[in-house]
Amino acid sequence: MESNNIIEIIKKLNIRNIAITAQSAKPNQIFFALPGISRHGNDFIDIALANGASLIITDQEPITSYSNVMVVKNIILVMKDVVNYLYPKFPKYLVAVTGTDGKTSVVNYFQQLCMLAAEQAASIGTLGVITTNNHLNKLLNQNKTKPECATTMSYIQTRYVLHQLATNGINFVALEASSHGLDQNRLMDIKFQAAAFTSFSRDHLDYHKTMNKYLDAKLKLFKENVVSDGIAVVNNNINELSIIQSKITDEFGLKLLSVEQQGDIQIIDVQSSLNGQKVHFRYKNSDYKFEVSIIGRVHITNILIALLLAVNVGFDSAKLIPLLSNLKPIKGRMEKIQFGNCYAFVDYALTPNALATMLTELRTLNNKGRLITIFGGSENRDAIARRVQMGIVASKLSDLVIVTDQDSGNEDPAAIRKEILQVAPSAVEIPNRGEAIKYAISIMVDNDMLLIAGKGHETRQVLKGRIINYNDMEQVKLHLKQLNKMSNQ
């Protein structure tokens, strides 16, 4: 009844959209003053009204009386009903990807495969909303002041994006589902035909507190958001595989497919070089081979997970497999630049497991020169434990470690560096990230390799609460030019 009344008011007021935040509210928009983790949306009613919001919905009586503020008993139910009224459309095929590492890669490869197969597709996640329509990309990313800040958007944002994608004829969409997003019910009643679990290792324990709770948050995707006859795709190399398999098949009743050893797709052989990889795999008793200019063995697993997702939302494997060789590297994921006989790589590796994987891979590709690693610590991400582990990993697997600033947020960057240096005493400390890159490039000689980890594609850096424009690959190119090393490329 509450929803029906509000929808009638929405019609009368000619409300066409839902304000994502009070700060972004505009005329002809409705704003939901939702309860939050630390503050209630009522704290922002004045801001929303000042910015022109036509209607405010809340579940708590505000201190001040307003003519266009309505109090409801079940604000979540009302919000869902309003969302269904304003943003009713969905793309025909939806898949979701969760996991500690690999989410961005899988959704991007899924989108690429669909596009190569001549279908309109999109990916949603850490890189923002990506389609081949630049105007649509701009429209759908305008509310994300920092595209990399939230892997999984709010429910309202997600429904708006899905509605716009469907309206623009995009039928295939892959979405990253983070543990935070799942735990905070950001996907609510959104259903997926298939979902994947890429990897699982320590992360976000500042939020989840225990590994069991972290795993439960990931599994929530399969429990609540995959349709009853849907498909789950899992990486067989996950240590907790038996628990995940049992939950997905026995408890949730989903069909399970897997990649890697003894999987539905078995990877027989991967020959890697600094120029790419040659892959031999087996699927449905047939052997296939392909080559890609993508570096990192883990990316082969991610590509084949994307393949299984695509096959299970209607694509013919015989059509997709020949297209695998056309897949392109993802920005900020083992992104390479060569100068002379040296290589620099920019990678998003934010976890000890991801860092170890990348460093081990690079060492196997070239053991003739030094392996130099630049990284720092980020704010509040399982803070000390993560920084310590990454310091240990970098020291063990690199010939030289340079500890620099990453995204300290409101923390003291010097204190973060100190925590890392305690377990990496032989590391070089260079606070300015750009200067750290310049120093590393200046000392590199033939066959040396440089890994710049932790920021990947990101275009901003947060230091002491201040946001500055910054990108690792741009810094690499800048200093190569300044040091006259670019000419050897």
Explain the meaning of each model-derived region:
Residues M1-D81, Y85, N239, I268-V270, ...:
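N-terminal leader/targeting and accessory segments in enzymes
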Residues M1-L13, S24-I30, H40-D43, N108, ...:
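ATP-dependent carboxylate-amine ligase
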Residues G41-F44, L49, Y66-N68, D81, ...:
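Short glycine-/acidic-enriched loop or helix-start segments at secondary-structure transitions
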Residues A53, N168-N171, N367-K368, N447:
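Short, high-confidence coil segments that cap the C-terminus of an alpha-helix
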Residues T58, P62-Y66, D183, F192-A344, ...:
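Acidic, Mg2+-coordinating active-site environments of NTP-dependent enzymes
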Residues V69-N74, S258, V428-N432, A436:
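Short acidic-hydrophobic, aromatic-tinged amphipathic segments that line or gate anion-handling sites
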Residues M79-N236, E240-G253, L304, A310-V313, ...:
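Phosphate-binding loop of NTP-binding sites
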